[in-house]
Amino acid sequence: MSESLRIIFAGTPDFAARHLDALLSSGHNIVGVFTQPDRPAGRGKKLMPSPVKVLAEDKGLPVFQPVSLRPQENQQLVADLQADVMVVVAYGLILPKAVLEMPRLGCINVHGSLLPRWRGAAPIQRSLWAGDAETGVTIMQMDVGLDTGDMLYKLSCPITAEDTSGTLYDKLAELGPQGLITTLKQLADGTAKPEVQDETLVTYAEKLSKEEARIDWSLSAAQLERCIRAFNPWPMSWLEIEGQPVKVWKASVIDTTTKAAPGTILEANKQGIQVATGDGILNLLSMQPAGKKAMSVQDLLNSRREWFVPGNRLA
């Protein structure tokens, strides 16, 4: 067995909680957990703890929830724990240089892409959006840049034609803890081999927005189908019909050309709603009108056939 490390864990969402859960059964000593402050959630806007806080408190771990790690007194919280290493997974706060240098072995981060591709906020979604054949996780040594640190360990997985950001998130939430435990063993043994990122291969995973998720019919059918999967479960691809937003859950590409203007409805039947795009035809299969549940196109046509008259154009 490798040396048992004193670990500070910093993370916030479910993705991070799955990594903390793996650490708890790894033989290492979790000396403190940092997570974002409780936030208002739900219709009642009740203050809700993060998934990481819920797990940490359930296991009796000390929890810290600073709004920022810039104030000296908050940095002292980290210093007082005398950690060997700080593990950061989707924490959501910037770690100042002073904090990065406090643990004996520094701070390591689990990132949801094969760096240097897709540095930034939305690596899982952007890998789908771009049509990448594979993605994975990178465990890296943190520095002051945005996902610029040396890479310690990588695990990859294929992206299938059915994957959404939701399914890919689950795959990487399985891979990440495996890579993390292996990396910690290497750090404890002194066998880790840091690899500098190739700056010529860098791409940036820009944040998603609801406006970007609005369907732009001038794009190709292939790109739109990828967007629909990349933006599922958030922010969800959508279009506007009679002034109300309609989310699109699933679509397919029909490999045929058309001379119809982008956005023109070509067919509407139980096989789907076929719409002309900038290149090819997009076949809408599952949609969700405002205030309703997601439904098959057949069910939607039964109640809203007037929305999808062939020859009409969608906005």
UniProtKB/Swiss-Prot annotation:
<dbReference type="GO" id="GO:0004479">
    <property type="term" value="F:methionyl-tRNA formyltransferase activity"/>
</dbReference>
<comment type="similarity">
    <text>Belongs to the Fmt family.</text>
</comment>
<dbReference type="InterPro" id="IPR005793">
    <property type="entry name" value="Formyl_trans_C"/>
</dbReference>
<dbReference type="InterPro" id="IPR005794">
    <property type="entry name" value="Fmt"/>
</dbReference>
<dbReference type="InterPro" id="IPR011034">
    <property type="entry name" value="Formyl_transferase-like_C_sf"/>
</dbReference>
<dbReference type="InterPro" id="IPR041711">
    <property type="entry name" value="Met-tRNA-FMT_N"/>
</dbReference>
<dbReference type="InterPro" id="IPR037022">
    <property type="entry name" value="Formyl_trans_C_sf"/>
</dbReference>
<dbReference type="GO" id="GO:0005829">
    <property type="term" value="C:cytosol"/>
</dbReference>
<dbReference type="Pfam" id="PF00551">
    <property type="entry name" value="Formyl_trans_N"/>
</dbReference>
<dbReference type="InterPro" id="IPR044135">
    <property type="entry name" value="Met-tRNA-FMT_C"/>
</dbReference>
<keyword id="KW-0808">Transferase</keyword>
<protein>
    <recommendedName>
        <fullName>Methionyl-tRNA formyltransferase</fullName>
        <ecNumber>2.1.2.9</ecNumber>
    </recommendedName>
</protein>
<dbReference type="InterPro" id="IPR001555">
    <property type="entry name" value="GART_AS"/>
</dbReference>
<comment type="function">
    <text>Attaches a formyl group to the free amino group of methionyl-tRNA(fMet). The formyl group appears to play a dual role in the initiator identity of N-formylmethionyl-tRNA by promoting its recognition by IF2 and preventing the misappropriation of this tRNA by the elongation apparatus.</text>
</comment>
<keyword id="KW-0648">Protein biosynthesis</keyword>
<dbReference type="Pfam" id="PF02911">
    <property type="entry name" value="Formyl_trans_C"/>
</dbReference>
<feature type="binding site">
    <location>
        <begin position="113"/>
        <end position="116"/>
    </location>
    <ligand>
        <name>(6S)-5,6,7,8-tetrahydrofolate</name>
    </ligand>
</feature>
<dbReference type="InterPro" id="IPR036477">
    <property type="entry name" value="Formyl_transf_N_sf"/>
</dbReference>
<dbReference type="InterPro" id="IPR002376">
    <property type="entry name" value="Formyl_transf_N"/>
</dbReference>
